């Protein structure tokens, strides 16, 4: 029988049909090649938005800089970055007036954080620009390299382990006449292989010392490396994102801590909370506006979009905000917070890898590095690239472009939210002094504006006033991309509101399925995703049960672990059948060993090993949870692991799942090819770093959640801990006298070696 699909929706309220409009199946687009073109676009656009500002020259680096602050007021609707200092300061003052003590309290909270934060905070985060090697590295390695170079240049404050002391070193490093850096390089030579008698390329890794004068060092310290943002859906063009170096990161962290503390106290801020907490917070603002408008007023909501939010923001404005927010605070605190915006006012954008050229006729490919863009003949480029390069050339120094205005993506999300909320705050009647008033929600560059007024003319006037106020603070509401509706229907940060937030379950679809980490983690993540969607996204019991069955099926196909009594033939079926036959209690076998699935929607919160433990044969338990099993390279597993989930839209989310360490929690070995490249030295450093940390955590089992504070080195701490533990164990009879003497001897030897060094 034919079914008319519209019949499916007869009984469904319109807002519940949102999941059927889902366009994002399949993989998101990834970028290939270099991001140089996108970065040049960003730099050129940012300067265009501020073109009527004042040009100055940085005295230290010689970089030309454009300052649009307090520039001409806009006369048209084009996006512009001419924020007015006095307007920003006034908006801050009114924000404080409406929330007495907010800045004071946030400063006190932040001061406490500043004094307690350890330098290992900076090891969080993925790729970081490593100024010592002039390219991207994992954050931990970049930090280790920076500290190593600092110490070899006589900067020792960082040894205390406090972030604030590391930042003192950063400040001092900028005053030094020169800095000496050790870089890795690789030599290639052709040699004849003794066995095959063929010529092969042999690579050797060397380290060389390089001196950077003050100017070169400053340029590197102020450099943001750029990459292309991957996996962005719904965009035709890619765009560039920035990754700052270690000198900037610590200062940014403290500014964002202060801003986060302020955002937590602002009801219109969509940051730093997320998920259901965010929905509740936002629903409150909407409720307030609707309750007040029932009798005499009408209420409209704008689903807002700002044009090029961060390219029109300005670090000088952020400096003004911080100066105001911290005005009654101690000098040292004000200084440390003002450094991040000052560094951003003098930032340099690294243009990435450069351009790739290929000659079809000669089958040649060659890369033009970014450093050459400044003086290469433009006849090799097409028109659009030529225009870009001509525009950017005056700004280039050593392959980086001077970029004073603009913020680059994702740098000061919290602080820019505070700026946005300060405008929403001005919508109260006591400030508009007329019949219309507004309120709304702000989360980084995304906003929703709710305007109330007695009639349509009032609504229009309110929107116009909001639009112009934004212009004064360097925020450009896009008239083309924002749309207005009766209050009750709008979208904000991919949450759709229709008389309440609508669960858009389809957004989560990409995170269903098998993640491909290992059998143990994948099972756990799979059921956790289903559980979370039942809690947060209106995933009903019947659908959840179906999702679970589909997941188990998918899982069995991925790992070729169909039930032991199935007819499906795979390359694992021989072993799995054999295990099935010799197992007494078949219900105790894990799904990944060909066992049955015992999950249903009531027990999704229990890890599979725990669920089946009582049902397992004893020898199976022994094999499954045996840390000495020689066939498994084990990593030590915390009881809770983090998986990164990619929803269809919006930022990647961290999801916790329970991890029980079994022989299925294997870790794939690192790809061998890296060992032949210039990365090898770095890899060895990284492993060394890892080993030291692991050893340290063996001595101080609690160190994973609380770093020891003090001035003794790691080695001293471990030696003294070993002595104390040994004495306690000896006195309580846990170890023999010979062992005790042996331990003491080793400790003395270590100390002796340290003294000699």
Curated annotation (Swiss-Prot):
A molecular function GO annotation: RNA-directed RNA polymerase activity
Keyword line: Eukaryotic host gene expression shutoff by virus, Eukaryotic host transcription shutoff by virus, Host cytoplasm, Host gene expression shutoff by virus, Host nucleus, Host-virus interaction, Inhibition of host RNA polymerase II by virus, Nucleotide-binding, Nucleotidyltransferase, Phosphoprotein, RNA-directed RNA polymerase, Transferase, Viral RNA replication, Viral transcription
GO biological process, one term: viral transcription
Primary location class: host cell
Residues of the RdRp catalytic domain: 286-483
Region of interest: Disordered: 50-82
Region called Promoter-binding site, residue ranges: 249-256
Compartments in which it is found: Host nucleus; Host cytoplasm
Catalyses which reaction(s): RNA(n) + a ribonucleoside 5'-triphosphate = RNA(n+1) + diphosphate
UniProt PTM: Phosphorylated by host PRKCA.
Superkingdom of source: Viruses
InterPro entries per record: RNA-dir_pol_NSvirus (IPR007099), RNA_pol_PB1_influenza (IPR001407)
Motif placement: Nuclear localization signal: 187-195, 203-216
EC number per UniProt: 2.7.7.48
Pfam short name (any one): Flu_PB1
Any one annotated GO CC term: host cell nucleus
Catalytic class of the enzyme: transferase
Its job: RNA-dependent RNA polymerase which is responsible for replication and transcription of virus RNA segments. The transcription of viral mRNAs occurs by a unique mechanism called cap-snatching. 5' methylated caps of cellular mRNAs are cleaved after 10-13 nucleotides by PA. In turn, these short capped RNAs are used as primers by PB1 for transcription of viral mRNAs. During virus replication, PB1 initiates RNA synthesis and copy vRNA into complementary RNA (cRNA) which in turn serves as a template for the production of more vRNAs.
Similarity comment text for this entry: Belongs to the influenza viruses polymerase PB1 family.
HAMAP family the record matches: INFV_RDRP (MF_04065)
Self-association state and partner proteins as the record states: Influenza RNA polymerase is composed of three subunits: PB1, PB2 and PA. Interacts (via N-terminus) with PA (via C-terminus). Interacts (via C-terminus) with PB2 (via N-terminus); this interaction is essential for transcription initiation. Interacts (via C-terminus) with human PKP2 (via N-terminus); the interaction competitively inhibits the interaction between the RNA polymerase subunits PB1 and PB2.
Protein's UniProt name: RNA-directed RNA polymerase catalytic subunit
Species whose genome carries this gene: Influenza A virus (strain A/USA:Albany/12/1951 H1N1)
Gene expressing this chain: PB1
């Amino acid at each position: 029988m034919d079914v008319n699909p519209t019949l499916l929706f007869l009984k469904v309220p319109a807002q519940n049909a949102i999941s059927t409009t889902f366009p994002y199946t399949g993989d998101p687009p990834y970028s290939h090649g270099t991001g140089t073109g996108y970065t040049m676009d960003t730099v050129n656009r940012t300067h265009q938005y501020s073109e009527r500002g004042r040009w100055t020259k940085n005295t230290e680096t010689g970089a030309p800089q454009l300052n649009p602050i307090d520039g001409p007021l806009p006369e048209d609707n084009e996006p512009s970055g001419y924020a007015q200092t006095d307007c920003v300061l006034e908006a801050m003052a009114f924000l404080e007036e409406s929330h007495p003590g907010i800045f004071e309290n946030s400063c006190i909270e932040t001061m406490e954080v500043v004094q307690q934060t350890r330098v290992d905070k900076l090891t969080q985060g993925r790729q970081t620009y490593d100024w010592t090697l002039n390219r991207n590295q994992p954050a931990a390695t970049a930090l280790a390299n920076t500290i190593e170079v600092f110490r070899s240049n006589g900067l020792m404050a960082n040894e205390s382990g406090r972030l604030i002391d590391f930042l003192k070193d950063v400040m001092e490093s900028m005053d030094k006449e020169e800095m000496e850096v050790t870089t890795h390089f690789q030599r290639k030579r052709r040699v004849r292989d003794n066995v095959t008698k063929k010529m092969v390329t042999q690579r050797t890794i060397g380290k060389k010392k390089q001196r950077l004068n003050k100017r070169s060092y400053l340029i590197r310290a102020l450099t943001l490396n750029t990459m292309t943002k991957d996996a962005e859906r719904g965009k035709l063009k890619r765009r560039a994102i920035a990754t700052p170096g270690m000198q900037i990161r610590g200062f940014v962290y403290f500014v964002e801590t202060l801003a986060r503390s302020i955002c937590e106290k602002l009801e219109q801020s969509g940051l730093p909370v997320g998920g259901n907490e965010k929905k509740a917070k936002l629903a409150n603002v909407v409720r307030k506006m609707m309750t007040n408008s029932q009798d005499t007023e009408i209420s409209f909501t704008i689903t807002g979009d700002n044009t090029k939010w961060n390219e029109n923001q300005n670090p000088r404005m952020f400096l003004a905000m911080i100066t105001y927010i911290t005005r009654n605070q101690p000098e040292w605190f004000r200084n440390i917070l003002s450094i991040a915006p000052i560094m951003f006012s003098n930032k340099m954008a690294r243009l990435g890898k450069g351009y790739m050229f290929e000659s079809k006729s000669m089958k040649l490919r060659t890369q033009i590095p970014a450093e050459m863009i400044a003086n290469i003949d433009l006849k090799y480029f097409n028109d659009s690239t030529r225009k870009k390069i001509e525009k950017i050339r005056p700004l280039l120094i050593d392959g980086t472009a001077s970029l004073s205005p603009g913020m680059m993506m994702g740098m000061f999300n919290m602080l820019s939210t505070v700026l946005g909320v300060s405008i929403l705050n001005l919508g109260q009647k006591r400030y508009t002094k007329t019949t219309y008033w507004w309120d709304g929600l702000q989360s980084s560059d995304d906003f929703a504006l709710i305007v109330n007024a007695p009639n349509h003319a009032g609504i229009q006037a309110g929107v116009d006033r909001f639009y112009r106020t934004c212009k004064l603070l360097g925020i450009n509401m896009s008239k083309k991309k924002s749309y207005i509706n009766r209050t009750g229907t709008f979208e904000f940060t991919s949450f759709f509101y229709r008389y309440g937030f609508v669960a858009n379950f389809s957004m989560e679809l990409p995170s269903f399925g098998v993640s491909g980490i290992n059998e143990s983690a994948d099972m756990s993540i799979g059921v956790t995703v289903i559980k979370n969607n039942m809690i947060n996204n209106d995933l009903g019991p019947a659908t959840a049960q179906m999702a679970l069955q589909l997941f188990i099926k998918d899982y069995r196909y991925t790992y070729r672990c169909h039930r032991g009594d199935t007819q499906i033939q795979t390359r694992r079926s021989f072993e799995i059948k054999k295990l099935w036959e010799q197992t007494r209690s078949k219900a105790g076998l894990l799904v990944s060993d060909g066992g049955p699935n015992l999950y249903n929607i009531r027990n999704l919160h229990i890890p599979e090993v725990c669920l089946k433990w009582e049902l397992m044969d004893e020898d199976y338990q022994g094999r499954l949870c045996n840390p000495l099993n020689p066939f498994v390279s084990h990593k030590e597993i915390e009881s809770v692991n983090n998986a990164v989930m990619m929803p269809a839209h919006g930022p990647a989310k961290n999801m916790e799942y329970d991890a029980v360490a079994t022989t299925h929690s294997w870790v794939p070995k690192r790809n061998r090819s890296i060992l032949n490249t210039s990365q090898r030295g770095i890899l060895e450093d990284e492993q060394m770093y890892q080993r030291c940390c692991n050893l340290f955590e063996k001595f101080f089992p609690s160190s994973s959640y609380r770093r020891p504070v003090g001035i003794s080195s790691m080695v001293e701490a471990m030696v003294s801990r070993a002595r104390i533990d040994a004495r306690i164990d000896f006195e309580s009879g846990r170890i023999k006298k010979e062992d005790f003497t042996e331990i003491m001897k080793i400790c003395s030897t270590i100390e002796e070696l340290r003294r000699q060094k």
